[in-house]
Amino acid sequence: LIKRPEQLAACFAGGADYLFQPDKQFAEFDSGDRTFQCARRIDVLKLWVAWKAHGDAGFAARIDHAMAIADYTRQRIAASDGAFVSIVSGSFTNVVFAWVPPELRPLAALHPADLDDQVRTQLHHLPPQIKARMQAEGTGMIGFQPVHGMNTFRMICMSTTLQTTDIDALLDAIDQYGNEI
């Protein structure tokens, strides 16, 4: 479409490692960092259109649903007997967590910066492998990004169709694939 495709990255790339992981499957096909839509420039238009379409009450209901699903996800992680650990605490629609192999449970530290290098390295390599397996088998799609040098899962709970059963299935798949690695 353009004479010099490299100019797209030069103009729009923010280099956000939390969005565009080089170690994910099919990274070479991810055009996100080469598009106008990736930058924050367009977000205000998307927000305005969504608000106009749903109105105040509809927009509030969407946010309440997203928060409820995120809270449910955090509750499932907390009740997982150490299979999952929350990496970033807080009350918002993003849930950042790690899967922990049985031999490392319970973790001596919950923050990546406090883990010993060997454990952090072991945990770092798991999310890309688990995500690739989920993609290959079509069981789910979840992002991951580094937090203090360790890849972690990042669940963004914004879809109005997302239900607690979807969260259960996703966490069960992560646990299953992690145990099979």
Stretches found by the model and what they are:
Residues 1-80:
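Active-site C-terminal subdomain of aminotransferase-like
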Residues 49-50, 96-99, 153-158:
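Short, hydrophobic beta-strand segments
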Residues 53-57, 103, 159-163:
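A generic structural motif
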Residues 72, 76-80, 126-138, 173-181:
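Generic non-transmembrane alpha-helical segments
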Residues 86-134:
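Conserved PLP-binding catalytic core of the aspartate aminotransferase-like
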Residues 107, 115-116, 147-181:
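PLP-dependent enzyme catalytic core of the Aspartate aminotransferase-like
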